[in-house]
Amino acid sequence: MPRTQRNDNFIDKTFTVMADIILKILPANQKAKEAFVYYRDGMSAQADGEYAEALDNYYEALKLEEDPNDRSYILYNIGIIHASNGDQEKALEYYNQSVDLNPRMPSALNNIAVIYHYQGEKAREEGREEEAEALYDKAAEYWKQAIRLAPNNYIEAQNWLKVTGRSEMDVFF
């Protein structure tokens, strides 16, 4: 039974009914509709913390989805799961694939920056100052891109950029 048929709460059931109606009237081919069902089930599993099930659904969606923008969101969600599981390198791989398909995705750019910043912190703790600075610079570049796309978001990143002297702008928003 598909995950979306197992939802217990009213909001999930309502969303599922609405999504099913939209799928029926959406002028999309069958393959795209199937991809959406897998994506929707992946999001539901991910929200429930069922990461293995979510990944299975996302991988199936990737096999079917052809639209680059839609693929970027699938890849982004796969990246989130890998980051949640502590696999930063794999998360970076998927976030970068997502940005390659959709360079206007500030959340993916932010997540890439967060990982580089974290890696910079670890390098600094281990006394690898040059490596830390290089990682911080990478984080700064990704945060600047994210902030340009969503100037009212990422306030902590904006402050960090200012405090560390990595900001060329006085005000982002």
UniProtKB/Swiss-Prot annotation:
Location (main, coarse): membrane
Chain's role: Essential for the assembly of the photosystem I (PSI) complex. May act as a chaperone-like factor to guide the assembly of the PSI subunits.
Gene: ycf3
Annotated family: Belongs to the Ycf3 family.
Entry coiled-coil feature ranges: none
Organism phylogeny: Bacteria, Bacillati, Cyanobacteriota, Cyanophyceae, Oscillatoriophycideae
Membrane topology, from the record: Peripheral membrane protein
Domain of life per record: Bacteria
Gene Ontology cellular component list: plasma membrane-derived thylakoid membrane
Gene Ontology BP, a term: photosynthesis
TPR repeat intervals: 35-68, 72-105, 120-153
Protein's name according to its UniProt entry: Photosystem I assembly protein Ycf3
HAMAP family: Ycf3
Pfam families: TPR_12 (PF13424)
UniProtKB keywords: Membrane, Photosynthesis, Repeat, Thylakoid, TPR repeat
